[in-house]
């Protein structure tokens, strides 16, 4: 039963909105808008060459985070996404605790989580496909690291390096 309204409470499995992710051909092309016009500060970023993408997160004064994704290499999920859907919203990430239990709960409720990846304790994830979520890819994520340590763990590139490689 997917409606979620029967027996619904104000609680839920998501602890908080983590970030909104935008697919772009070049992160460097988005930085002037995100940083200089809208006022976000660079938080962290890295190149995930094995997965065919680079990412950069920017935090706004109120705490909201936008993540920019750009493809690296000649193929991969992000390059495919940009070919079929063009630049724009890629996914919304929600933080959860005990992600494996949350995945089972979703399945029990009739949802079909896809692409679970629980190998890295610093970032465990599972997705809800846009076909089931009114066109929005939803990522549920859990990290065993405190948030400050996540930034330290993932801040592999400073912004200038990231933009130069973009």
Regions found by a protein language model. Give the residues of each.
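Vicinal oxygen chelate
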Residues: 1-12, 24-32, 36-38, 46, 56-59, 66, 72-73, 84-132, ...
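Short, flexible turn/loop "capping" segments at secondary-structure junctions
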Residues: 10-14, 84-85
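Long, hydrophobic N-terminal alpha-helical segment
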Residues: 13-54, 58, 76
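Short, structured motif recognition centered on aromatic/hydrophobic residues
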Residues: 17-24, 34, 58, 63-69, ...
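Short loop/beta submotifs within extracellular cysteine-rich repeat domains
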Residues: 30, 41, 64-66, 76-77, ...
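Feature marks short, surface-exposed loop/turn motifs that line or immediately flank catalytic pockets
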Residues: 72-75, 144
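Regulatory and interaction patches adjacent to catalytic/ligand-binding sites
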Residues: 81
